[in-house]
Amino acid sequence: MLQIGEDVDYLLIPREVRLAGGVWRVISKPATKEAVFRERLIQFLQEEGRTLEDVARIIEKSTPHPPQPPKKAKVPRVRRVPQMVTPPLRLVVGTYDSSNGSDSELSDFDTSKVKGNRGSGKTRKVRKMPVSYLGSKFLGSDESEDDQELVEAFLRRGEKKPSAPPPRRRVNLPVPMFENNLGPQPSKGDRWREYVSQVSWGKLKQRVRGWAPRSGSEVGQAQQSSIAERAGEMRHSHTSPDLDDSSRNTGDLSDQTLITRRWKPKIKWVSLRRCRKEQVPPLAHGTAEEPPEAAENQGAGAAAEHGVEAAASQRPEAAASPRAEAAANPRAEATANPRAEAAANPRAEAAASPRAEAAANPRAEAAANPRAEATANPRAEAAANPRAEATANPRAEAAVNPRTEAAVNPRTEAAANPRAEAAVNPRAEATASPRAEAEVNQKTEATASPRAETAASPRVEAAASLRVEAAASPRAEATVSPRAEAVATPRAETAASARVEAAANLRAGVLPDQRAEAIDSQRAEGPVNQSTGATENQRVEVLADQRAGVLHDQREEAGPQAILEASADSGSRARKQVKTVRFQTPGRFSWFHMRRKAFWHTPRLPTLPKRGPRAGAGEARSLRVLRADTRADMEHREQEEQL
């Protein structure tokens, strides 16, 4: 009778132990039951006039002394292949870690003979290869390590870092017991790499049946690189993702490491807007017919982006000068070109500056200031007023004001020059409200016809309907296909000039650039139109507000993404890449769910034993299946042991 501590898991108590005289069955009972049992036993013995010693003697006598194996049904469990000779018993000194019952050496060596014990399944199912080492060099290594090494590995389990990668000793060198702390200890990654390099890649791949690299720049290209590099490459890609990323940024680093991966930029659409703002301006510079406008586009973009301050400065000037010109005159004139220029120039700058200002008080001042200047008076009113309002509730009021219409409109007008053209007309119409008036110049163009219609009415409707309608007005079209048509439209032409690049790109489907340029110039223009200060903010507002002018700014609001989509919709519908999964074959991971078809002949990684048939399942399975199952199980187990 063994006394067992309270929190011991009964499942971990071996069912039988080989001790002197053979195999002892261990009957464990919870302490309470145990106490009851002893009490009753003693009571019984007293009645019988016997003592515990007598009982012990009787038991002793009744036990066949050379313990003959019970003639029980040990038969099914007999191995078809005679079992390997069990290794001579070694004293394994180590702690028994009951949390890892499967690793106990005791049950491994001591009960390896006792196949029969059903109960010992828990302990008997010892993996020769402790689970903790599945990922290690033992996994695929071709040398069959002798048990000695495995035992050492098991005992080494606790130590966090072995002083060297696990000894690959063919020759038993004396191993000094002190750790050489001289060099820096290899990191976990280094050790893993050390392991991996000892496994031939081909072997590993054979082992892991369905294995294929994660499709991705890393491993995919790693495979193309020569096998020699492969291990190193895997090493790097696995160990130092951070190093890798940094190397991604710093070109030289990646060259130092032997990774010759092509650098594929990771693109997030959000970043596109920024990039476009920064890059397109130079593009605009080169491309735009009017470098100034391109510059201002830049200004719009850059200013819009960076420089609310920059915007502030540029915008006021641009707003004041070009905007005034562009707004009053050029808006209409500039429509074709000046609009681009005006757009680019005043808008960019106007965008930049008022944007910046607009940023601060932006709409109000920026609007008031550049818009006022730019717009002359109406813009000033529209700007100051609706702008201020627009600033506050820019879109909402803007919606009320043509400014909203204009705001959406500017988009529209920005999109379609008609707005510029319309500016004169619809602006008159749009003129209804100060913004409209203010925008009459600018927005009138913007107002165009749909704009005009839309303009007076809610910009928002205008936006929505306009965007819808927008089909009607180029902006609408431009909206729908806005940039594409915008290309068609003067504004587009303006865009075409300023955005020629953009225009071409523009709806053409060079979304990003076009959008960027469109964004820059139109932003410049659109914002100028919409709100002098609106450029960046307007875009933002336009986002917010034009969201009011939703359709419009759906593009805006969706931002580059929407931009992309919108123009993808219009211009490059064909170009939009949809990733379809063509064949749903049992692909890379079939090995995972088709596991049951184990191939008896292939060496398998140790798996948990299949559970015996459940209680209810008996009827369902024919005996034949059961027998096959058992046989498979036996073979599996024996293979495991050989492994």
UniProtKB/Swiss-Prot annotation:
Region annotated Disordered, chain positions: 93-124, 156-191, 206-492, 519-540, 553-577, 603-643
Biased composition regions of type Basic and acidic residues, renumbered to the chain: 230-247, 626-643
BP GO terms, sorted: microtubule cytoskeleton organization; regulation of mitotic nuclear division
Main location: cytoplasm
Skewed-composition ranges (Basic residues): 261-276
Source organism superkingdom: Eukaryota
Metal-binding found in the keyword field: no
The keyword Phosphoprotein is annotated on this UniProt entry: yes
Cell compartments where the protein resides: Cytoplasm; Cytoplasm, Cytoskeleton, Microtubule organizing center, Centrosome
Low complexity biased stretches: 294-399, 409-432, 459-473
Task of the protein: Core component of the 3M complex, a complex required to regulate microtubule dynamics and genome integrity. It is unclear how the 3M complex regulates microtubules, it could act by controlling the level of a microtubule stabilizer. Required for localization of CUL7 to the centrosome.
Protein name: Coiled-coil domain-containing protein 8
